[in-house]
């Protein structure tokens, strides 16, 4: 009795090859001076080499292309393409051939086959070809499972499969930082600055085609990665946005809440979704990759029960001449407040108007705009301070100092509007 029967050979052969872009052929030039012993021998060999560029033989980069010599690296965001070929190596006609390609990741199994229909028959020395594509969205171990089933002339059903394991690497390291904008000194606004640090983790340069921020429905975004020169927008990274291996680049964005959300004080509190980064790059011979981050979140700053912000203020004012500012008071609490406004003078800033006036009831998440008048008795950069809001129900006073700064100049100097 035979314990281990011989392994049956299949009539069909399966070949799987990864499809990638070719690379430019490179050679190492070897030269010498004419008075050296080899004379012009090395230079003549380079001129006769068909892979060199005429007139620039010492240039390492040639005019020819090199086909991929190995499987290579696969990075997150790239498109994995593979050529699958099933060839009939026998002298028999094989029937009901079904080729199935699945990609097994750490979290799911995907069917990549273009068609799940079986081929009626396959004659000797004929083949079935298929090309599969898949945008890689996970890092880690991936297994390409290729299964082939067919029926022989004798009616015997045959089946075999092959496994191809490969690793998906991370092409970019993305780090984000949030900065809450400050209006002058201490009056915190709703504007948020996002700094995105992107590092090239591959071994080849990248052309950064697009790095954009897709904001959430609560925010509008402004990109701060360009400057205006002669009426044209010029990128701060130059005309050639290449990112060399292990290099890092910083992108900056400003987000501001939409008007319908900014007017509702309670919505911007706590953890809010900012948006997500969309990064598109190109590598060897234009091979494209794309990466989208998950939704970015940040902790919104706390304003307390009452928030005071500035809507309008002049940059420069004249000495001992009244000027006007517009303040916005927002009730950030969940109860109705009855507020009283008090204005306290400082050594340089003097408020004009009645202190201790009633502002009336302010409902939750509602706002009130106030036009205030003041003057400065000291030249220079002066800080506006001395506003007090008192909640008559809780007898609680909210103090607002260093609200903003103005430049005070002599009245003999004309203030440019």
Curated annotation (Swiss-Prot):
InterPro entries per record: TRAPPC13 (IPR010378), TRAPPC13_C (IPR055428), TRAPPC13_M (IPR055429), TRAPPC13_N (IPR055427)
Record Pfam families: TRAPPC13_C, TRAPPC13_M, TRAPPC13_N
Gene Ontology cellular component terms for the protein in this record: TRAPPIII protein complex
Family, similarity comment: Belongs to the TRAPPC13 family.
Subunit comment: Part of the multisubunit TRAPP (transport protein particle) complex.
Name this protein carries in UniProt: Trafficking protein particle complex subunit 13
Annotated source species: Pongo abelii
Gene name per UniProt: TRAPPC13
């Amino acid at each position: 009795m035979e314990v281990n029967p011989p392994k049956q050979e299949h009539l069909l052969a399966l070949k799987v090859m990864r499809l990638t872009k070719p690379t430019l052929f490179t050679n190492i030039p070897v030269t010498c001076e004419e008075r050296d012993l080899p004379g012009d021998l090395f230079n003549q060999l380079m001129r006769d080499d068909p892979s060199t560029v005429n007139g620039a033989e010492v240039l390492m980069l040639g005019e020819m292309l090199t086909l991929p010599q190995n499987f290579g690296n696969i990075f997150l965001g790239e498109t994995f393409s593979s050529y699958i070929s099933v060839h009939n190596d026998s002298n028999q006609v094989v029937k009901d051939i079904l080729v199935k390609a699945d990609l097994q990741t750490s979290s799911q199994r995907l069917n990549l086959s273009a068609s799940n229909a079986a081929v009626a028959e396959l004659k000797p020395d004929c083949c079935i070809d298929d090309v599969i594509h898949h945008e890689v969205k996970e890092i880690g171990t991936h297994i390409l499972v290729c299964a082939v089933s067919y029926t022989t002339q004798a009616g015997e059903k045959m089946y075999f499969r092959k496994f191809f394991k490969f690793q998906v690497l991370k092409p970019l390291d993305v780090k984000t930082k949030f900065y809450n904008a400050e209006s002058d000194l201490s009056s915190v606004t709703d504007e948020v600055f996002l700094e995105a640090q992107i590092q090239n983790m591959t071994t080849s340069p990248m052309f950064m085609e697009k790095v954009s921020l897709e904001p959430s429905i609560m925010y509008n975004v402004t990109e701060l990665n360009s400057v205006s020169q002669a009426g044209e927008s010029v990128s701060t990274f130059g005309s050639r946005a290449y990112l060399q291996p292990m290099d890092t680049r910083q992108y900056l964005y400003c987000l501001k809440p939409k008007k319908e959300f900014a007017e509702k004080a309670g919505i911007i509190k706590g953890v809010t979704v900012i948006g997500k980064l969309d990064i598109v790059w190109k590598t060897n011979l234009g091979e494209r990759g794309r990466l989208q981050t998950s939704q970015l979140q940040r902790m919104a700053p706390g304003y307390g029960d009452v928030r005071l912000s500035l809507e309008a203020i002049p940059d420069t004012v004249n000495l001992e001449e009244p000027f006007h500012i517009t303040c916005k008071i927002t009730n950030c609490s969940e109860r109705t407040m009855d507020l009283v406004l008090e204005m306290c003078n400082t050594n340089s800033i003097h408020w004009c108007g009645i202190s201790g006036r009633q502002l009336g009831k302010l409902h939750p998440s509602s706002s009130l705009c106030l036009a205030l008048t003041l003057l400065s008795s000291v030249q220079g950069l002066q800080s506006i301070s001395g506003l007090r809001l008192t909640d008559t129900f809780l007898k609680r006073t909210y103090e607002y100092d260093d609200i903003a700064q103005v430049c005070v100049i002599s009245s003999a100097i004309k203030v440019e509007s």
